[in-house]
């Protein structure tokens, strides 16, 4: 019986990773009229457009921006050890993706007490009404927090995070002279 339970957890984790990889690959596909462009103004008054595909349920811009640096880390915490492990797989995937273009190590830390300048992925104190794939992403100058009811929602949230960064984030080699910023905002979405 224990082998079956362990096998089921392993299979669940492998399936989740597969879904994450497919979703991340598909996130670059533009669906007509199903995207969101928000004009955001930086501190100098220069506008930039934020493209989010698919269009989120709500987007509220705030003042400021988060800057991803070589000292940034990814903090993870689930409601259970199993959720934390699933979130770790998502964090590993996004770390690999972001590190290619930024060159930043982005350590993954198992803690519900993220420090300033970090990304925090969690299911703690989440909103059940968002469903299994919904998420809330709150970005301030101090950090990015993606909260979801289930790890599947965190997977969708990190796709949005990736889209909020400069387009050079998709480079397979380190890009120099880029400030890796995310506009301060609150985004809520569910399929």
Where are the predicted features?
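Position-driven detector of the extreme protein N-terminus
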Residues: 2, 25-26
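Hydrophobic membrane-insertion alpha-helices, especially the h-region
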Residues: 15-25
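Acidic, contiguous N-terminal accessory segments
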Residues: 22, 28-190
């Amino acid at each position: 019986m224990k082998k079956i339970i362990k096998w089921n957890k392993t299979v669940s984790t492998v399936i989740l990773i597969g879904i994450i990889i497919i979703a991340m690959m598909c996130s670059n596909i533009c669906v007509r009229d199903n995207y969101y462009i928000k004009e955001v103004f930086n501190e100098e008054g220069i506008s930039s457009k934020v493209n989010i595909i698919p269009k989120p349920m709500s987007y509220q811009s705030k003042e400021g921006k988060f800057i991803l640096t070589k000292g940034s880390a990814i903090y993870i915490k689930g409601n259970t050890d199993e959720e934390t492990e699933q979130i770790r797989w998502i964090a590993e995937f996004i770390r690999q993706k972001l590190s290619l273009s930024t060159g930043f190590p982005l350590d993954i830390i198992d803690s519900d007490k993220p420090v300033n300048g970090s990304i925090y992925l969690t299911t703690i104190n989440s909103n059940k009404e968002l469903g299994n794939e919904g998420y809330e992403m709150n970005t301030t100058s101090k950090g990015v927090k993606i909260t979801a009811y289930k790890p599947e929602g965190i997977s969708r949230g990190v796709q949005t995070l990736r889209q909020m960064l400069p387009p050079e984030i998709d480079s397979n080699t380190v890009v120099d002279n880029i400030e890796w910023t995310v506009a301060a905002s609150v985004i809520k979405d569910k399929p």
